[in-house]
Amino acid sequence: MYASVIIYTLVALCGVMSSPVQEAEVAPRAIEPRMPTFADIPFPRFPSHNNHHHNEKDKGKDKGNGKGVDKNNGGGCDTGTNTQLNACSAGSPYCCSSDGNGGHICSNTTACDQKVICCNNNNGFQICIGEIDFNVPVTINIIYD
């Protein structure tokens, strides 16, 4: 008799546990458009760090590397172009820089003065990103023709 009570109890518990329960509906306000919050506000740019730690007394001196005096750059840093390797998985790289009016100027070369390389992936889309300052809002527009 005790065995049958235990078996019937287990069967009843299994039936209760396996019966489906209707989920709560999502409140309509949870999926409606919302106003911008505090986290959506673009804040001003933070000052950049000086990673080279140049002394003011060394600024503009010839360092003996054959590059001469560089008064605009501290400590004799190399001011040459930024020659990029082909980081694209397909297609050819090209250099893009901002024109200051919200647009971009692109050139079909790998010798860049800027550090962002875009890839022409034969009518596909691939983005190769170099050094981007994420202290400012970054917008990537992809226009489908």
Curated annotation (Swiss-Prot):
Disruption phenotype: Does not affect mycoparasitic activity but alters wettability and severely impairs root attachment and colonization. Keywords: Cell wall, Disulfide bond, Glycoprotein, Secreted, Signal. It is found in: Secreted; Secreted, Cell wall. Induction: Expression is detected in planta up to 5 days after root inoculation. Constitutively expressed at low levels in mycelia in young cultures but gene expression is not detected in sporulating hyphae or in non-germinating spores. Carbon limitation stimulates expression whereas nitrogen or phosphate starvation down-regulate expression. Residues 1-18 form the signal peptide. Glycans are attached at residue 108. Disulfide bonds join 88-118, 95-112, 96-106, 119-128. It comes from the Eukaryota. Aerial growth, conidiation, and dispersal of filamentous fungi in the environment rely upon a capability of their secreting small amphipathic proteins called hydrophobins (HPBs) with low sequence identity. Class I can self-assemble into an outermost layer of rodlet bundles on aerial cell surfaces, conferring cellular hydrophobicity that supports fungal growth, development and dispersal; whereas Class II form highly ordered films at water-air interfaces through intermolecular interactions but contribute nothing to the rodlet structure. Self-assembles to form functional amyloid fibrils called rodlets. Self-assembly into fibrillar rodlets occurs spontaneously at hydrophobic:hydrophilic interfaces and the rodlets further associate laterally to form amphipathic monolayers. Belongs to the fungal hydrophobin family. This is Class I hydrophobin 1.
